[in-house]
């Protein structure tokens, strides 16, 4: 679709209307999934989807220092989805009569609208590929940029950034496009500079300040990121750092009696209880990721 990137979820059974907010972790995990399926099938549709998703993140959710922001809001001018919807008149005005009609027929754009009186461009009723309309998509993307900008949640979370670093490293190995590896390495340097003190990690960065605490997920995903960078570069520094942070995670979070890892270390007095999370929800649990890290190490 126009501008690329995945929204959080669909609000209807037909997958027409998304909740328009876009989260870093969703896009990172989906890049991993698409690259993995491409590796198994060699179907370039999957690699193309992964690359377009990465392009969205690098263009819309990346700080000047190389870290990745947390989310892009759903609302524009107080209306959810307004930034992403079009009228038929807009499409014709922007693309011209002939191109506008072709695009509208393919992408379900009507005078009546397919969503609350306006249109969400979609291919649910069409057999064409969006690549057939790359020129029109770019034109509409640049037209859309003149609208009120979407709010960015500009927190930089180490765990979500680590997911994105791992995804970009995988994407580099699938595509051999150096820009993805460069972005992954830049982000890791940002995290190392701003969210690491020795083997102590900090959860978040905002307004030139880091948080005070860290959790199992921060270590687990950061170790994964370092391992993926090692596999992409064969630079042993990444492997050695992964091993060091793995030992530190064991020291801080391990349940030495019953196995597994607690969410927080014993020095964190802000939590009245210290759960041991094993459920994989919107993101894999820290325990799952640590098990994966141990196997790879």
Where in the sequence are the language-model features?
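Glycan-recognition and catalytic cores of secretory/periplasmic carbohydrate-active enzymes
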Residues: 1-297
């Amino acid at each position: 679709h126009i501008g690329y990137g995945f929204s959080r979820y669909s609000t209807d059974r037909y997958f027409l209307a998304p909740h328009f907010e876009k989260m870093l972790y969703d896009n990172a995990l989906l890049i991993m999934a698409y690259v993995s399926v491409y590796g198994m099938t060699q179907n370039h549709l999957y690699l193309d989807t992964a690359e377009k998703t990465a392009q969205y993140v690098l263009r819309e959710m990346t700080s000047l220092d190389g870290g990745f922001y947390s989310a892009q809001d759903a609302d524009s001018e107080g209306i959810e989805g307004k930034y992403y919807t079009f009228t038929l008149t807009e499409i014709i005005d922007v693309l011209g009569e002939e191109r506008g009609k072709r695009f509208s027929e393919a992408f379900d754009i009507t005078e009546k609208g397919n969503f609350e009186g306006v249109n969400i461009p979609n291919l649910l009723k069409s057999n064409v590929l969006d690549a057939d309309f790359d020129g029109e998509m770019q034109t509409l993307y640049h037209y859309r940029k003149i609208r009120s900008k979407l709010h960015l949640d500009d927190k930089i979370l180490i765990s979500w950034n680590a997911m994105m670093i791992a995804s970009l490293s995988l994407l580099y190995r699938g595509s051999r496009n150096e820009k993805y590896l460069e972005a992954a390495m830049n982000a890791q340097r940002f995290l190392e500079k701003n969210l690491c003190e020795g083997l102590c990690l900090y959860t978040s960065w905002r307004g030139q300040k880091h948080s005070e605490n860290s959790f199992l997920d921060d270590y687990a995903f950061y170790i994964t990121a370092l391992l993926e960078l090692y596999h992409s570069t064969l630079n042993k520094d990444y492997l050695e750092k992964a091993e060091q942070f793995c030992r530190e995670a064991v020291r801080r979070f391990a349940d030495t009696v019953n196995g597994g890892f607690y969410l927080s270390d014993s020095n964190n007095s802000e939590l009245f209880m210290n759960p041991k999370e094993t459920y994989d929800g919107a993101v894999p649990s820290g325990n799952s990721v640590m098990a994966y890290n141990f196997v790879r190490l």
